[in-house]
UniProtKB/Swiss-Prot annotation:
<dbReference type="GO" id="GO:0005524">
    <property type="term" value="F:ATP binding"/>
</dbReference>
<keyword id="KW-0507">mRNA processing</keyword>
<keyword id="KW-0547">Nucleotide-binding</keyword>
<dbReference type="GO" id="GO:0008270">
    <property type="term" value="F:zinc ion binding"/>
</dbReference>
<dbReference type="GO" id="GO:0000289">
    <property type="term" value="P:nuclear-transcribed mRNA poly(A) tail shortening"/>
</dbReference>
<dbReference type="GO" id="GO:0000932">
    <property type="term" value="C:P-body"/>
</dbReference>
<dbReference type="InterPro" id="IPR041332">
    <property type="entry name" value="Pan3_PK"/>
</dbReference>
<feature type="zinc finger region" description="C3H1-type">
    <location>
        <begin position="24"/>
        <end position="53"/>
    </location>
</feature>
<dbReference type="InterPro" id="IPR011009">
    <property type="entry name" value="Kinase-like_dom_sf"/>
</dbReference>
<feature type="binding site">
    <location>
        <begin position="345"/>
        <end position="352"/>
    </location>
    <ligand>
        <name>ATP</name>
    </ligand>
</feature>
<keyword id="KW-0067">ATP-binding</keyword>
<protein>
    <recommendedName>
        <fullName>PAN2-PAN3 deadenylation complex subunit PAN3</fullName>
    </recommendedName>
</protein>
<keyword id="KW-0862">Zinc</keyword>
<keyword id="KW-0863">Zinc-finger</keyword>
<feature type="region of interest" description="Disordered">
    <location>
        <begin position="1"/>
        <end position="24"/>
    </location>
</feature>
<keyword id="KW-0175">Coiled coil</keyword>
<keyword id="KW-0479">Metal-binding</keyword>
Length: 648
């Protein structure tokens, strides 16, 4: 028995290299290469091929396949002599080709030297090329339906059953039959069949959770579904201020402007800024229906019409976030005199820097306003610098940098609100060049910041050096140096520019820029969350048009039968829930969640019960959405055909 399982060494040597058969074996790879990695008879007359990278002869592909040398042979234990004889490989067995399943296409007998070692790098990714579903013989081999048939060669039979291309409907519930028979998302230009289709990603629900601010636990329930109360309150106040009117105000109606409302908080005439008394009104344009801020110069007589045309042409090019955009200028006599009107963008609930920082407070004692924080001052400096950079780049000058002509809105946002007025008023009398006016802008800029820092109006700054020295006690030396550079006159032969000033405050500009980006992220977060509210509103309006409605054809029980009755029960499930003790359940989250699931048409199941508990339905939101769409589409169809009762 031992001799049967373990033959003598002289018998095992016969397995080394098959017996030579002549030159017909020169293309056959030696079996020792595959088993041991080398052949010791290569230099001793072995006629088989020892080059691993050489492709075998095509003629060997169709040789006899009656024996596979890799498969184990049946060896009876009772015949040891036969076993010793079969251990020697014949040349016919050496020439046998590997086993290849039927229907796999043209076989490839190329093998590597490390066939027994797994090499991931040698595996190439499958990429279909020149694939035609209508070609049933794409691989050039007869099609067989045996157990080893290639699934890719049998796809041709599906070509006749696939529908043709049609229109893709984004809002369809069944995405396997979109837009009717044969609808598919991609046109029929490609070579792949149209399988089950899905809506694009932007049509699905995805919560926006990239921003989250610290809130108290009792605030989170409402905050999770709506914008913050403070932001909503500010927006509502601005909307109310925009629509505010004053009945019997006595203000005239201009040619294209109506509903004038005064915005001045002081009724005293002040001629220090423009040389004429100026007033500000809110008005609505009858052509655009938008609201504008009208600044009126009382008693001005226009002597040169080119002044308005030339100045407005240049200032309309200024588009900057820290400059109030001017739209037009015109003259009128509706106020009982010759007045010059400038139309600017209207920013509701805005205050001037004069009113916010330099207005003394009245109490038990008359006291000066409190000091402005340094970070707020740097924010003002960065914003005014941004405005002057745009104005000076267009070869213009602001000329009106006064606390009473710079408005302040929410989040310390400031804007220059009286630009272009002095250019029109002093169009003929001005003798200074644009470069000189720009140098004056820098000096006025420095005095403005100094006035805000010291709490004294610019007209009361008699001793500039004393005011600069007083900054050291409340602010940093960097702020003092920046203000001193703006106020100081330029050296002979040199001229200061806003670009030089920007390079000096680059650190503070980047800090302010970062704060602006954070504020933009917060607003974008709230906007993205409110984006889905339109879907919920549409679902509610559609649902209310279906429920408790008589049939357009005349039947009064249309909404109480069929699918409409289940929608009515869904209405009760969403809005008319009660607690175990009979108290109304007013959970806003439940209402929003159910309506969102209905609009999305998810597979979640919901139990709908009638009010008498006699009828119970177990449905999915997908089925409810299909019922919902069919019922509403029926109403739409009757509304287009003009059926009686369609407008009930």
């Amino acid at each position: 028995m031992a001799a049967t399982r373990y033959p003598p060494n002289d018998l095992r040597r016969q397995v080394g290299s098959p017996r030579s058969k002549g030159r017909e074996n020169k293309d056959t790879l030696c079996r020792n290469i595959l088993i041991y990695g080398n052949c010791r008879y290569e230099d001793q007359g072995c006629t088989f091929n020892h080059d691993q990278n050489k492709n075998p002869s095509p003629q060997a592909d169709f040789s006899k396949k009656t024996f596979n040398v890799d498969s184990p042979a049946f060896t009876p234990s009772s015949q040891p002599q036969v076993l010793a004889k079969k251990t020697t490989l014949s040349s016919q067995a050496a020439n046998a080709a590997p086993f290849t399943p039927r229907g796999a296409g043209t076989p490839n007998l190329q093998q590597t030297a490390e066939a027994s070692v797994f090499n991931p790098a040698a595996i190439r990714e499958f990429t279909p090329q020149n694939y035609d579903i209508g070609n049933t013989n794409s691989n050039g081999v007869p099609q067989e339906n045996g157990i080893y048939s290639d699934p890719f060669t049998t796809m041709g039979s599906l070509g006749s059953t696939l529908p043709s291309a049609g229109q893709y409907n984004l809002y369809a519930s069944d995405h396997n039959s979109l837009g009717g028979p044969g609808a598919q998302f991609y046109p029929q230009h490609g070579s792949f069949p149209a399988g089950p289709l899905q809506p694009p990603n932007y049509h699905l629900y995805q919560p926006h959770d990239s921003y989250r601010q610290e809130l108290q636990p009792w605030q989170r329930a409402t905050y999770d579904f709506f914008i913050p109360a403070k932001m909503r309150e500010e927006l509502q106040k601005k909307m109310f201020a925009t629509q505010q009117v004053m009945p019997n105000s006595g203000l005239p109606q201009l040619e294209r402007w109506h509903s004038l409302f005064p915005l001045d908080t002081n009724n005293r005439k002040n001629t220090s800024s423009f040389g004429y008394p100026s007033w500000v009104y809110k008005a609505q344009n009858s052509r655009t229906a938008r609201h504008y801020a009208l600044r009126r110069l009382e008693g001005y007589r226009l002597t040169n019409e080119k002044a308005i045309l030339t100045v407005m042409k240049e200032w309309k090019k200024i588009k900057n976030g820290n400059v109030v955009t001017v739209h037009e200028a015109f003259t009128t006599r509706e106020f009982g005199d010759s007045s010059l009107i400038f139309a600017y963008d209207y920013h509701p609930l805005s205050k001037t820097l004069q009113e916010h920082h330099l207005q003394p407070t009245h109490g038990n004692r008359y006291r000066a306003p409190s000091a402005v924080p340094e970070n707020v001052l740097w924010g003002y400096i960065c914003q005014i610098t941004n405005a002057l950079k745009t104005i000076h780049s267009n070869k213009l000058a602001a000329r009106c940098l006064e606390p009473s002509k710079i408005i302040l809105s929410d989040n310390n946002r400031i804007r220059l609100s009286a630009c272009s007025i002095l250019d029109v008023v002093q169009f003929e009398s001005n003798t200074k060049s644009v470069a000189e006016l720009q140098q004056e802008d820098l000096v006025k800029f420095g005095k403005l910041i100094l006035a805000l820092a010291t709490g004294a109006p610019p007209a009361h700054l008699n001793n500039i050096q004393v005011a600069l020295d007083s900054l050291v006690t409340k602010y940093s030396a960097n702020l003092k140096d920046a203000v001193a550079w703006l106020i100081a006159p330029s050296n002979p032969g040199e001229s200061k520019s806003i670009e030089n000033f920007i390079s000096g405050i680059a650190t503070h500009m980047t800090a302010f820029f970062d704060l602006a980006l954070q504020d933009g992220d917060e607003k974008q977060f709230h906007l993205a969350r409110e984006l889905e509210n339109g879907r919920i509103a549409r679902s509610m309006m559609k649902l209310m048009t279906i429920i408790e409605r008589a049939e357009p054809g005349g039947a009064q029980s249309w909404s109480e039968t069929g699918e409409r009755y289940q929608l009515k029960l869904f209405r009760d499930y969403v809005f008319h829930r009660v607690e175990a003790d009979g108290k109304p359940n007013l959970a806003v989250g439940h209402m929003l969640s159910c309506l969102s699931k209905l609009d999305a048409g998810i597979d979640e199941m919901v139990v709908l019960t009638s009010r008498d508990n006699e009828t119970v339905f177990v449905l999915s939101y997908r089925e409810l959405k299909q019922m919902f769409d069919r019922a509403f589409n029926e109403l739409v169809k009757h509304s287009k055909t003009g059926a009686p009762g369609a407008n009930n």
